[in-house]
Amino acid sequence: MRTAGHSQEEVRLGGTLVSRWIALSLLLVASASGAEPGPIRLYDLTYTLDIDAARPDQVQMAWDHCHAVAALQGLVNRHEPVLYIRFAHSRYRNRNIDHFWLEKLSEPGGWLHGRPIRRIETLADLIAQFRSHIRGLVVYDPNVAATSNVASTVAGVEDLLPVRYDRSEGSLYRLLVEGERSLPVRRWLVGPDGASLFTGAGRIPGTDLPSTGSAKCDAYLWMKHNYLDAGRCDGAYGAYYLDQYWLKKPRNAALNHHCLTNHDFFVARKAFFFDLGVWADETPVDDPDQELGTDLETLKALLLSAYHHGGKENMIHIGGFVPWAHKYTTHGDAGGRHDPVPTEWEYGRVISAYNGFMDADAISYGAMANASFFMHFPMRPEYTQKWVTRQELAERGYLDADGQVRFDGREFLIFYVGDYDCAAWLYQRTMDIWDDPARGQVPMMWCISPVLDRRAPMAMDYMRRTATPNDYFASADNGAGYCEPGMLQEPRGVSGLPCGLDAWARHCKTFYDRWGLSVTGFIIYAHGPELNEAGLDCYASFSGNGIVPSGGPASLLHKGMPVLRFDHDVNEGDPADAARHVVQRIAQRRTEGHPPFHWFRNILKTPTWYVRTYDAIQQINPKIELLDAPTFFELYRIHLESQGPSSP
């Protein structure tokens, strides 16, 4: 079943032969039985990227193999880290991302140092190796695209492998259903003869529920009835990933952006999977004959059930993102009437109304493998950070004898170093952004959502262990997950549910305390309302040293928490252009009456870019001073205290 193969001796990780790793021994805490963990099983899935995307048979092979392997990995790694996949390749370094992380984790003193690695050569051998983890198969319908996501849900709950119905020669279906190593089919989402079960007519199969008129939505409501409503899924985990519609347009984004390899973590967590539009005023490109708004109403039904089965108490962690290059937007041939960014915002508004938040694996760097392996990484109980004292500020010349801010004509600047609101972007870009040799030369406020430690704990730990004194960490949008917090406030639009602020505060405080965070570097209001008094109180309970919302008052001190409204995005590639933008905007802000504290957002910029941009800023206006986050926000708080009454 493999289209490519290499001997063990031919596979290298950063110049280290895999055969050399086999001589290493593991430095992990022994299990309760005292036994050492077994070897890591390594499977190379990169052959699925080395295909001709114009050939349907090769595209189907890539989809089928990635889907089955990801689900298998989620099952195998549910309780311990055993199966590791080699898949994604860096666009900025000539390295495989998964090998990068395996190398890092295998360094002396590392989590995996000395643990033997055994390569598995073929998909058939991989399945045979882990046959004891698999109860059988769930077969889904190539003519009802939504059934591929339903199959991922079923796979996680019932310990099954998802297989697309395809009786053509050489298909995965032929191997696993009709071949010598066949497995029992435990769940059919299509007739054994290939006829569709979900037709958009009559009643939803196996239920008394009337059809929605959409086979797509009927499949999801069948899933809801049998898995979410029945409490068999964990409602605290959802997964918004592109369904098998990808097979029609594999080149609309990076070839790895089917994001099937992202499924493993959510399969392990028994999450519910979906791919639905969020607009009530248009029909989706993948289901144009449905009644207007059916996708949205189906999504709301899923979210409400999830809310009642874990989300109410724990929030709903939803991996993935709007598949804007393929569906639901104006981009290319995605067939929608709304632009991608408003569609993102509307999606955020809807899920937040049910206590949902995004772990937003967005296009460009959305593919991620091995999260079900990484989730077992042994984090420290806490990662502390020091906040600056007023005595230290005075000693550094920032405060006068009366304890007031000494501006001396200076303009204080801070950059929001983002966007790290999803595990996939952090996993992909650490090697070229964090490991940039210029890091440490200027202060940088790294804004990373702390909830990413569920899927990429090794990256967050690596950053903390290798941080310089100029690296400080704050939370990304909008806290411990990308949630529109105004939609947690009563009255709640869309859902009409009770206030969700207490659940959000408990959720965020757990992660902020673990990672030593006290600043939320950006809060996106988007299509939701601004924070009201209760919402500000919520953030003050876990982010007391500052927030930067996208709306509301330009400056505010709320119960001691400094609030600074966001300003421009500065994302010019040329540092000279970026510097001119910053300098001009600071001058404009001052004429508009803003205080000499300035925040600008940047997306996936390297430390080298920041060094060169700040050098160029200094050449234009040496009075502009880039500060570290504690200094910036503490000075801003002191300044606000001097301005008179604050929010009580």
How would you label these PLM feature ranges?
Residues 371-464:
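Active-site beta->alpha N-cap acidic-glycine motif
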Residues 36-381:
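Preference for solvent-exposed, low-hydrophobicity sequence contexts
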Residues 449-510, 514-517:
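Substrate-binding cleft of extracellular glycoside hydrolase catalytic domains
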Residues 29-37:
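Bacterial Sec-dependent signal peptides at the C-terminal "C-region" and cleavage site
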Residues 46-68, 83-97, 104, 111-112, ...:
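Acidic-and-aromatic substrate-binding clefts and catalytic sites of carbohydrate-active enzymes
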Residues 292-323, 413, 417-441, 451, ...:
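Catalytic grooves of carbohydrate-active enzymes
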Residues 19-30:
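Bacterial N-terminal signal peptides
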Residues 1-18:
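N-terminal secretory signal peptides that target proteins for export/translocation
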